[in-house]
């Protein structure tokens, strides 16, 4: 279908353009397009924009800038893809320590800001629109809208990681001093991104499904609600902690404006009445099905996605996760945050007793059914060639390093359990990459309302989250019933409206690669990361300790040669699995709250490329 067509167009385009460069704020795309007058037709505009729809297979690295959309995939230990990126948060843990959470990021690890290359290419197109002889046509408007969307996207991705940037909206003349520009304040960059998204909404066409797999008005609105919510919460919570990461010029009125923009953009999507939470009435499977279905074009929840065919365009999700391993595991922190089936926090003796028989704590008769559709329960089939009794206990020792589970909780979400393609070959899986779904709209809307006025907006928040609850048969939101004030709960001091919405976001979006962004924008590392260390399932004190599947293969509490690590010490009645050797991390993660909320800028960017106009991020 369209996959091969787009792939061939892209390969030809790259050969013509010769896209190269480091940051390239000041260069035009090299070579020629298909004519001597660039973008003379809408066909040429479309072909040019196809490059921004690409995501790696990074073994086919034909572009010299970041992805224009979120890529699906998996590397042993997680990686940066949708299915694995939560290993850089408190949701999942890997066989390797997250350098950022551990406070071990170094200045020498700073990378090129390659998204400026994509921005330069988009600026080149936007500055040559007058060449098009089809100006004003529906196709012309669509592709202009796509260009504005992608420019906003590339700036936003850098903004998340680096904060203040230089806003460049023209291909700069390398002989002019104007390329030597300082970093603008955060709010200027955020406002510029939002302005580009307003233009994208104005130009893009309206679609009622995701069949074209191209951007449309509601996708731009979805990103606008995300950007506005991101910056509103970033400024609010970093300002409240009086750290070095907020815009010192920002006012409370400005912060409220961001929340209002997030509400308005989400409401525009909601008011169309086109999109809906995917719900066939199967409370135990509808949620999971969405993340493993190859073709989502008919799914009413999915605004935009990237389809993988498992052949020309594939990923490694199944390869690494369809035996319960992947050198990762879901954390107890995430598992414990799901409510009970009657809508109460899962705490105290009830939690401990359930964990004494592995899998009982996951049962949909006890817990929110989204949990058993995210984490493997005993009896869960993971591959079409599996033979009963299927998944019995987690593979704490795998048949290979990448088939080992690190916490005792195996990730089920994203695994195509009935996949008919190659199960174990590299880049032969077809797990889809969902970019935006209607749940994102509802969650953004609810969170922004809670930030504006939880009390006054309580019923609107309940109504917005109701479809998410209905899909899995959970009771409606009750802010008092769900309020968790346990001493070990990181958000126990938040007001109940914000706490409930944040939990709902964590649960609904679990293991979709977005948790770290949330922690950073909430300035919540000191509550959730600093001094913490990930743990998993209960081992000592549960039936896992002497399970016959393991026999004598598990080695722990020895001076050397251990292949399993546990909390506590020998003789403790309850000991939990931890993913890595804790030696050197006895005091937990050492995330530096005065430095690690933003990544370091590469030295070359501070000197040669900006003439010394850029300054380094705080703490670096």
Task: Explain the meaning of each model-derived region.
Residues 36, 63-83, 168-170, 205-222, ...:
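Short, surface-exposed recognition loops and adjoining beta-strand edges that mediate ligand/DNA contacts
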Residues 22-70, 354-356, 365, 602-620:
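Membrane-proximal, proline-rich intrinsically disordered regions
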Residues 439-445, 455-485:
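Active/binding-pocket-proximal capping segment
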Residues 121, 189, 196, 240, ...:
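Alpha-helical solenoid repeat scaffolds, predominantly canonical TPR units
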Residues 1-20:
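Sec-dependent bacterial lipoprotein signal peptides
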Residues 159-166, 208, 230-239, 451-455:
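Short coil/turn linking the two alpha-helices of tandem helical-hairpin repeats
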Residues 46-59, 84-162, 176-191, 195-212, ...:
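Conserved, well-structured interaction surfaces
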Residues 22, 115-118, 192, 283-340, ...:
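Long, intrinsically disordered, low-complexity segments
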